[in-house]
A protein has these predicted regions:
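Helix-to-loop junctions at the C-terminal end of transmembrane segments
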Residues: 1-11, 225-239, 325
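Conserved MFS/SLC helix-loop-helix module at the cytosolic interface between two early adjacent transmembrane helices
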Residues: 1-36
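Helix-breaking motifs and short loop linkers at transmembrane-helix boundaries and internal kinks
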Residues: 10, 31-37, 48, 65, ...
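Paired small-residue
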Residues: 21, 25-28, 36-44, 267-274
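Cytoplasmic helix-loop-helix junction between adjacent transmembrane helices
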Residues: 41-78
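Glycine-rich segments within core transmembrane alpha-helices of 12-TM secondary carriers
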Residues: 71-95, 117-118, 307-317
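Extracytoplasmic gate region of multi-pass secondary transporters
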Residues: 168-231, 283, 287, 317-318
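C-terminal transmembrane helical hairpin of 12-TM major facilitator-type secondary transporters
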Residues: 240-289
Length: 364
């Protein structure tokens, strides 16, 4: 429903309000006093943010053809590691410096201050974002026609290769269900390490919140660079599945090696940096697969469905990591589990999605 609303009312009037409400709901976490209040706020936050990511992926298909999509999705998704790169030390500083300021605890200030950028971004989106090329005042008529012609050719290429465009096709397609499973595996790996990375550093390197924040910058910075480089190379060659599978397997191997008991903290940091870079890059390049054969109503519904099913891994993974860590009193089984999820996702990708991207030749 979220992506259908985006098509109906326009991206600027859908994505903008999502970001504003997202920030406000996130900030309301500072008022939480009981477990049930926390669950309620987290549920509302999930409802609000659920339409944002698939909406942006769909929005990018309004502007970029398949041959440029890997680097464009990578550019968008670098916001994830960049937010970790910038946000980790800032979060550490807020927790350390703002504790008891104004009668609030550090974690309460954290929710207030980190909600502000989301609200501001939402306002700017509603004012300045062009929903489609037809709405872009900064394009002249020749540029607009050239872009629209290329997008039409891209859609025609999907249909020629048996692409799906009707709403029901998104749920009847076996490829869509396989992509749900692939994305579930990548999200399992990503969320599991993202939620527990500070705790892992706390047990192996330092207990200082600010230092933990600074150390966390390293994997996020490496991931941002890797995502862009792999995305650009994937678009240049027109190859998708092996780019995705290779970085996923490298990340999985790094997860496995980092799980070796007694591994030195610095070496563990290097391996986790490789693991996070691999998994985030695989998750970024993944979105070139559904947009290669889904179009029209099927694209909106299919992208949202894949994202929704995959994000169940975001709920399950941190829970499983916590349970395994508590049961075995170390994170070795949890890290092995995260690596296994990536390997399964990579195997499915290579087995079922080895077709090269259409229309990869460069145009002036």
């Amino acid at each position: 429903p979220a992506n259908m609303m985006l098509r109906k009312i326009g991206a600027k009037y859908w994505l903008g309000p999502i970001m504003i409400v997202w920030g406000l709901v996130s900030a309301s976490t500072l008022l939480v006093r009981t477990d049930y209040q926390f669950y309620a706020v987290r549920f509302l936050l999930g409802v609000v943010e659920s339409g944002f990511f698939p909406g942006v992926i769909l929005y990018l298909t309004f502007w970029y053809t398949g041959r440029d999509r890997a680097k464009m999705v990578a550019a968008f998704m670098t916001a994830i590691p960049i937010s970790g790169l910038v946000g980790s030390p800032i979060s550490g500083w807020i927790l350390d410096a703002m504790s008891s300021a104004g009668g609030l605890r550090g974690w309460q200030w954290l929710y207030i201050m980190e909600a502000i950028p989301s609200v501001i971004a939402g306002i700017f989106t509603m004012i300045f974002l062009a929903s489609t090329p037809r709405d872009a005042k900064w394009l002249n008529e020749d540029e607009r026609k050239l872009l629209l012609d290329r997008l039409e050719q891209d859609e025609a290429g999907k249909h020629a290769l048996g692409g799906r465009h009707r709403l029901a096709d998104a749920f009847r397609s076996g490829r869509v269900w396989l992509l749900c499973l692939v994305y579930f595996g990548f999200v399992m790996s990503n969320y599991g390490i993202t939620f527990w990375l500070p705790t892992l550093f706390k047990h192996t390197l330092t207990t200082d919140p600010l230092k933990i924040g600074l150390l966390t910058m390293i994997p996020w910075g490496a991931a941002a660079v890797t995502m862009v480089l792999v995305g650009r190379h994937s678009d240049k060659t027109g190859e998708r599945s092996w780019h995705i599978a290779t970085v996923a397997v490298v990340g999985a191997i790094a997860f496995g090696l980092s799980a070796i008991p007694g591994i030195p903290g610095v070496l563990g940091l290097i391996l986790l940096t490789i693991a996070i870079s691999g998994i985030l890059t695989a998750a970024s390049s993944f979105w070139t697969l559904p947009t290669a054969f889904l179009s029209g109503a099927a694209a909106g519904a299919g992208i949202a469905w894949i994202n929704s099913v995959g994000n169940l891994g975001g709920f399950l993974s941190p829970f499983l990591v916590g349970k395994l860590t508590s049961a075995f009193h170390n994170m070795t089984p949890a890290l092995l589990m995260l690596g296994f999820c990536s390997i399964v996702a990579a195997a499915i990708t290579v087995i079922f999605f080895r077709r090269r991207a259409p229309n990869t030749e460069r145009q002036p």
